[in-house]
Amino acid sequence: ENNFATETEKLELGGSMRYNYRDADVVTVGSSQRFLQSGDSYSNSNKANSNKETGFKADFRMEWRPDSMTNIIFRPNVSYDKTRGASVAESGTFNEDPYQYVVNPNDYLNFDNIESDDPLRDTRINATNEHNLSKSNSLSANATLQLNRKLNNEGRNITFRGSFGYGDDDSDQYAQSETRYY
């Protein structure tokens, strides 16, 4: 965050700016066994998440005193935020321990990998592949203008104040999930 300020007899300026960026990737690999009376069940999963966020915010303040009876204050600000997210998840359930057949069952969870060659087909109960995407953008701009004039030295004033605001938000999401039973 950056701040600045300056002042003269008739003019006072100040403001700040902030920029933020975040990029996070998470990969999770799982394997579990359920102990059931009707027979054990085995599950394997892969998940990858990627999230990116960018943000910018700035505000400004100007106070002008053209004479001893008048002051004008102008305060604009703007902010922008952008986010992007993506995730891929693959999972499978088996009626026998898949490690009896292959070294890494998690290599056989993606539909593309098991279409032509599936060494776990005889023990596979189901497989699920999911894809999710999201994005959003947000922009806002605001400003306030105030004009103040003393009418006399006894404390009477007249003030005019106006404000402006603009906002634009947009977000999109996409999700696909497919489960196949064997």
Segments and roles (model prediction):
Residues 1-182:
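Primarily recognizes Gram-negative and organellar outer-membrane beta-barrels
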